[in-house]
């Protein structure tokens, strides 16, 4: 609590604003990333070591800001001056203090943050920093009163001298932070959002799966505000676990038809099908059941075979049958996935019409989806399987390159990259050794993609913008 939640996740952010910041790189406790500093060399050496030994790119990072603790000192002076101004002063002090506490440390207690946050959380405590800024303003008044009391100066000269002297504090802060807050000429979020959408096939009302904020909100902005690629549908996998979002996905939006989800609402409402266990151990019993039924059929008794196929389908491990007879079964005992290797029959004509690249010289009869290592599939993953089965290669389905393997349903071996997206295909692209549609990739990179002005000298490239570039340079 004290070392991480208070020190690292609150006081570090506090000191960024009133003492100084090492750089704008997200830190996880490293001595060279995201610490607070002062600009006073001997203090910084004690805090984070000799900063002169850092590599050039860290020393010249635009997020390197030093305030020499001047705002901090002014705030402490203002805090003390307010608290020791008699009864009225202490009453005012407690008002500001509780504003400071309730928007700062109280939020730390409430959030109970775990390690390895996906991003810096300084924005959560902005109210606390505003409260401290009140004390900074009072610090100026406090110094004026001190000069009047101890130096016997008149109010006007004291106010003039202190105001001019303290004016250097915001000037210093502005001069340090201007370059890493200047977004002029930079359109990375908008352009990279368009790049994701431009990576999609131009026909067929494509679907793109996203997962985080940075690969979702720019797409929504472009579609909803700029009217760009409104024929495509952005589907956030984080939200796809909820019934209200599935409701939205089942409705048309702009020029995009609804997503291919046939489930009734009662099948995905909150509390229903939140997850379905993967039980490959069932396979042995099912195989034995089919073998016995086929054996009886050879003897002329086809009733058992007809019944078992009526219960579980022609192939009990085929995707549509698993969805129909197992996952969506009314029998709670059958709400499992009885294999860790699902097969999906491939409509070859649909694949030929789809517009996807066809590596090799043939289209497989079946696509194999491995669930090895998975103990269950969650609602969002079930929806992905449902859409894959219902789309039948007639509606292109993509996943953003920024989505991690843990959210790819173990289907990375079926992806072909066409830009900033991977396209779902029926091919085992790992075995074929073809992971990129080079023609579409080249066309996207050289003729369609925009880069938000980051090619211009002096444009501020923060960590998020750099990560967007990495997704292009290191697919």
Regions found by a protein language model. Name each.
Residues 1-125, 132-205, 217-469, 473-475:
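ER/secretory pathway lumenal C-terminal domains and tails of membrane proteins involved
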């Amino acid at each position: 609590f004290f070392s991480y939640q208070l020190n690292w996740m609150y006081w570090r952010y506090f000191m960024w604003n009133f003492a100084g910041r090492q750089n704008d790189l997200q830190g996880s406790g490293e001595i060279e990333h995201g610490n607070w500093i002062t600009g006073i060399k001997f203090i910084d050496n004690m805090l984070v070591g000799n900063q002169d030994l850092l590599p050039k790119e860290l020393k010249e990072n635009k997020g390197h800001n030093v305030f020499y603790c001047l705002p901090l000192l002014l705030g402490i002076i203002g805090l003390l001056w307010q608290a020791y101004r008699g009864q009225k002063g202490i009453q005012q002090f407690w008002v500001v203090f509780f504003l400071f506490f309730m928007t700062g440390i109280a939020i730390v207690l409430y959030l109970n943050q775990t390690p390895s946050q996906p991003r810096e959380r300084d924005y959560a405590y902005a109210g606390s920093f505003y409260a401290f800024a009140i004390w900074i303003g009072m610090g100026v008044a406090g110094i004026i009163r001190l000069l009047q009391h101890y130096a016997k100066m008149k109010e006007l000269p004291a106010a003039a001298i202190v105001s001019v002297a303290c004016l250097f504090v915001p000037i210093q802060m502005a001069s340090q932070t201007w370059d890493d807050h200047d977004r002029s000429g930079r359109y990375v979020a908008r352009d990279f959002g368009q790049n994701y959408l431009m990576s999609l096939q131009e026909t067929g009302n494509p679907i793109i799966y996203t997962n985080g904020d940075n690969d979702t909100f720019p797409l929504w902005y472009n579609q909803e505000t700029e009217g760009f690629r409104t024929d495509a549908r952005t589907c956030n996998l984080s939200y796809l676990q909820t019934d209200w979002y599935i409701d939205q996905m089942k409705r048309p939006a702009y020029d995009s038809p609804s997503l291919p989800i046939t489930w009734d609402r009662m099948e995905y409402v909150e509390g229903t099908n939140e997850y379905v266990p993967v039980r490959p151990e069932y396979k042995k019993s099912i195989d034995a059941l089919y073998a016995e039924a086929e054996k009886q059929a050879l003897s002329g008794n086809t009733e058992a075979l007809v019944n078992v196929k009526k219960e579980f389908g022609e192939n009990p491990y085929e995707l549509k049958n698993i969805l129909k007879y197992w996952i969506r079964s009314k029998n709670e005992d059958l709400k499992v996935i009885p294999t860790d290797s699902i097969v999906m029959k491939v409509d070859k004509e649909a694949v030929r019409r789809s517009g996807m690249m066809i590596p090799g010289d043939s289209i497989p009869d079946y696509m194999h989806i491995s669930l090895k290592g998975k103990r269950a599939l969650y609602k969002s993953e079930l929806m992905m399987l449902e859409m894959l089965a219902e789309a039948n290669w007639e509606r292109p389905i993509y996943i953003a390159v920024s989505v991690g393997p843990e959210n790819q349903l173990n289907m990375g071996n079926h992806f072909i990259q066409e830009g900033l997206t991977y396209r779902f295909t029926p091919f085992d692209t790992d075995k074929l050794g073809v992971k990129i549609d080079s023609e579409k990739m080249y066309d996207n990179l050289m003729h369609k993609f925009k880069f938000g002005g980051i090619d211009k000298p002096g444009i501020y490239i923060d960590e998020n913008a750099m990560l967007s570039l990495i997704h292009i340079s290191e697919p």
